[in-house]
C-alpha cells in the first residue's frame, strides 16, 4: 500500500468505527446500563469476526451482521450529528461536512458506516472509499466525499480528534438520558 492509501484507510477506519467503538456502546449503556454496552460490543465483534460476507461463515454470520446493523442504526445517526457538532468546534469545514453528509451518507452497502465517514470526509476535504485490493482481491467501495485535497498524515490526527470529540459529546448525551431516566423511573 502506498502512503496515501494507508492514510486514507486509517481515516476511513477511524471514521466508520466512531459508531462501533464509542457512540453505540455509550448509547446502549445509557439505555440498559453497562450490560447494554457489553452486549452491543459482543454483537459488533462477532459481526466483525464472522460477518456473512465470506463463504465460510455465511450461515453463522448472517444473523449477527443484521443484528449489528439494527443495533447501530440509531447510534450511527446520533454519531453523525455529534460529529458535525465537533467539526464546528474544531473549526474544520462544517459546510462541506454537511453537504457531503447529505449527498453520501447512504452510499455504503451497510446502512450505518457511511454516516460518520461522510461527515469526516467532508470535514477534512478528502475522498474515502474507492476500489482497493485486500489480500490480493479487488474490493469495490463507493466513493465518499470530495477530493478537495490529497490525504495527508495530519488527516489521521483530525480523524482521531473527531472520534474523541464525538465520544465526549456522546458521554454528555448519555448523562442527559440517564438523568432523565432516573427522574422518570
Annotated model-derived regions:
Residues 3-38, 43, 51-185:
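Hydrophobic alpha-helical transmembrane segments
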Amino acid at each position: 500500500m502506498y502512503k496515501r492509501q494507508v492514510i486514507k484507510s486509517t481515516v476511513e477506519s477511524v471514521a466508520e468505527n466512531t459508531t462501533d467503538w464509542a457512540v453505540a456502546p455509550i448509547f446502549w449503556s445509557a439505555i440498559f446500563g453497562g450490560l447494554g454496552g457489553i452486549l452491543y460490543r459482543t454483537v459488533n465483534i462477532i459481526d466483525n469476526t464472522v460477518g456473512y460476507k465470506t463463504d465460510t461463515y455465511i450461515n453463522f454470520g448472517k444473523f449477527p451482521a443484521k443484528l449489528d446493523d439494527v443495533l447501530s442504526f440509531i447510534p450511527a445517526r446520533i454519531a453523525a450529528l455529534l460529529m458535525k457538532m465537533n467539526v464546528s468546534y474544531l473549526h474544520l469545514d462544517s459546510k462541506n461536512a454537511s453537504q457531503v453528509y447529505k449527498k453520501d451518507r447512504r452510499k455504503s452497502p451497510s446502512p450505518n458506516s457511511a454516516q460518520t465517514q461522510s461527515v469526516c470526509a467532508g470535514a477534512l476535504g478528502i475522498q474515502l472509499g474507492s476500489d482497493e485490493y485486500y489480500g490480493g482481491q479487488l474490493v469495490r467501495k463507493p466513493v465518499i466525499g470530495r477530493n478537495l485535497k490529497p490525504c495527508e498524515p495530519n488527516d489521521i490526527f483530525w480523524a482521531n480528534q473527531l472520534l474523541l470529540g464525538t465520544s465526549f459529546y456522546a458521554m454528555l448525551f448519555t448523562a442527559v438520558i440517564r438523568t432523565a431516566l432516573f427522574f422518570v423511573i
